[in-house]
Amino acid sequence: MAAAVVLAAGLCVARRAVAVAGPRGVQVRGAAGVTDGDEVAKAQQAAPGGAAPTIFSRILDRSLPADILYEDQQCLAFRDVAPQAPVHFLVIPKKPIPRISQAEEEDQQLLGHLLLVAKETAKAEGLGDGYRLVINDGKLGAQSVYHLHIHVLGGRQLQWPPG
């Protein structure tokens, strides 16, 4: 079953733009750089499994650059290349779990650790007034990369409902 898990609170921080090196050269994206439709289209085309490396596995093995905010033996936090808020970063496990719905009982400690890292990194990024955590799961949940990841969004007043 596909789902999107969303946890929310209020917020406020400075707006940012990100320069992204890609196949079309360097692009600069602001907080509204990608539309919901773009992400849904990506999710519809994303392969939910397979042997091909994901963009996140390539960031983990350092074959793709990332603006890393935090790293330990279990996870990595880095800025999103297409931010949807003034502050938008991802927290990913180093263990390749494709979807939250495929996490196992043995992943319980790791999943809790990801949330704590999200909280501490949000604090370090100045999101003391609040932020939102999002985990997309599966095609209908608009998951576009099949490596579990938590989006942390903040730096402005977020709206409800999100979808």
From Swiss-Prot:
- Keyword line: Acetylation, Apoptosis, Hydrolase, Lipid biosynthesis, Lipid metabolism, Mitochondrion, Nucleotide-binding, Steroid biosynthesis, Transit peptide
Motif Histidine triad motif positions after renumbering to this chain: 147-151
Per UniProt, AMP binds at 63, 80, 136, 142-145, 149-151
Q: Which InterPro entries does the record associate with it?
A: Histidine_triad_CS (IPR019808), Histidine_triad_HIT (IPR001310), HIT-like (IPR011146), HIT-like_sf (IPR036265)
Active site, UniProt feature: 149 (tele-amp-histidine intermediate)
Presequence range in chain numbering: 1-17
Q: Which reaction does it catalyse?
A: adenosine 5'-phosphoramidate + H2O = AMP + NH4(+)
Transit peptide among the record's keywords?
Answer: yes
| Protein name, per record | Adenosine 5'-monophosphoramidase HINT2
Q: Name its species.
A: Bos taurus
Q: Which gene encodes it?
A: HINT2
